[in-house]
């Protein structure tokens, strides 16, 4: 009986860890999307889009942010997949 208790405790601990990882990844995506929105709003300001140097810098940052979002989404998909796999096992 003690072995079963330990196993259940370990399963719950692992499940919490997987859930936390998934939640952190979602928060990361939300944060990056907010930053992207701010950059796009900044780019739409006349003094920014009318200045080729500023405009190019902001465009580069937007591209970087979009890449970060893609990477973060891949990490979230991995975390969500691991959680789903765990839930299917138990």
Regions found by a protein language model. Give the residues of each.
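Charged, heptad-repeat coiled-coil alpha-helices that serve as long linker/dimerization "arms"
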Residues: 1-90
């Amino acid at each position: 009986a003690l072995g079963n208790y330990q196993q259940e405790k370990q399963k719950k601990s692992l499940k919490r860890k997987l859930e936390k990882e998934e939640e952190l990844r979602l928060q990361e995506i939300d944060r990056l999307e907010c930053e992207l929105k701010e950059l796009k709003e900044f780019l739409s300001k006349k003094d920014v889009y009318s200045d080729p140097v500023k405009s190019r810098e902001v465009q580069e940052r937007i591209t970087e942010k979009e890449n970060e979002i893609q990477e973060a989404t891949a990490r979230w998909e991995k975390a969500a997949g691991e959680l789903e796999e765990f839930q299917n096992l138990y």
